[in-house]
């Protein structure tokens, strides 16, 4: 799996989704995927296996658990264990839910 595969899977759920940021803000709800850092497996003083730490960010003007459940079910289906963090962005007047996970070899 690559981050592009994930973006396509999220789009198939009906959410606008892109890497990084949109050129113009889409209608809500929408998602972005971002690379956070690498956590490669290292052996014999070299990077043995690529392990990328990514974030899937979901934005909506209301707290809407059915959308979150769709995303969580898809991440589980794709076997991407995740941690979830939620906040309200006052300046944007949006809820933000961040799913953090690793993509190995992608």
Name these PLM-found stretches:
Residues 1-18, 35-106:
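Charged, amphipathic alpha-helical segments and their flanking helix caps
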């Amino acid at each position: 799996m690559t981050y592009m595969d994930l973006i396509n899977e999220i789009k198939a759920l009906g959410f606008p989704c892109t890497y990084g940021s949109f050129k113009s803000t889409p209608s809500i709800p929408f998602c972005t995927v971002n690379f956070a850092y690498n956590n490669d497996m290292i052996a014999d003083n070299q990077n043995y296996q690529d392990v990328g730490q990514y974030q899937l960010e979901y934005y909506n003007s209301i707290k809407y658990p059915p959308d979150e459940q769709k995303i969580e079910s898809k991440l589980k289906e794709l076997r991407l264990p995740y941690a979830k963090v939620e906040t309200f962005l006052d300046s944007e007047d949006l809820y933000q839910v961040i799913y953090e996970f690793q993509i190995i070899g992608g």
